[in-house]
Regions:
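Pocket-edge structural micro-motifs
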Residues: 33-34, 98, 123, 144, ...
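A short, polar/proline- and glycine-enriched secondary-structure boundary/capping micro-motif
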Residues: 42-44, 160-163
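Low-complexity, Gly/Ser/Thr/Pro-rich intrinsically disordered linker/tail segments
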Residues: 161-195
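Cleft-lining beta-strand/loop regions that shape enzyme active-site pockets
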Residues: 1-141
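C-terminal "exit" segments of structured domains
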Residues: 134-158
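Short, intrinsically disordered/low-complexity patches at protein termini
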Residues: 88-89, 144-146, 174, 186-188
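Generic "edge-of-domain/loop-turn" microfeature
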Residues: 39, 72, 103, 147, ...
Length: 195
């Protein structure tokens, strides 16, 4: 048996997509892609330049934050985006787009955003890798010399354990039959029509 996949992958971002992007769909909807919170020379600099370019550009009443395939990273890197989106959420609606490749710091970031008003998560359940992990890749050989273990060096909060291995379920699930951003735009327009 082989699972039949669609010709077009609507769930994941294309491999060659930029890590950071801001664009407007129309006057009512803006889109923000953050594909990493990693802190290394290349991504930290790119993230800071990108952040500086967008920090005064969030104007639409609806905002899609695309965290699909976000590989996680450092809390310090996510903090600036959280502050920006927290301020924005007081006047606009946030739609957080997630998939099974949204993990680690992206999941923690999502839980923080969910505490704000006007936030809806959409997509699919996240990876469930937010309490344990290794930033430094330290291995320890056991006394027998036969086995080696890979230790966690992260201090996860007990409140995050409920999501470990299970992930964060979205408020609204999306199907894999059509473009996910277009599905979110449809949700926004439908909600706008009810107001």
């Amino acid at each position: 048996y082989s699972k039949q996949l669609n010709d077009t992958d609507h769930v994941n971002l294309p491999k060659n997509s930029s890590k950071f992007q801001l664009k407007s769909y129309d006057d009512a909807i803006q889109y923000l892609r953050i594909q990493t919170f990693q802190r290394n020379n290349m991504t930290t600099n790119a993230s800071m330049v990108f952040y500086d370019s967008i920090k005064n550009a969030l104007r639409a009443p609806n905002f899609i934050i695309d965290l699909r395939n976000n590989e996680g990273g450092a809390r310090k890197e996510a903090r600036k985006y959280f502050s920006l989106l927290k301020k924005y959420s007081k006047k606009g609606r946030l739609y957080i787009l997630l998939n099974n490749q949204s993990l680690s710091q992206a999941e923690i970031f999502t839980l923080q955003l969910k505490q704000l008003k006007n936030v809806t998560t959409v997509g699919q359940t996240t990876k469930g890798m937010l309490s344990y992990g290794s930033n430094y890749g330290r291995r320890e050989q056991l006394p027998s010399g036969i086995f080696e273990i890979y230790l966690t060096d992260m201090k996860g909060k007990a409140s995050l354990l409920q999501y470990e291995d299970y992930g964060i379920s979205p408020d609204i699930s999306l199907n894999d039959q059509s473009d996910w951003i277009e599905q979110v735009v449809g949700i926004i327009k439908k909600k706008k029509g009810k107001q």
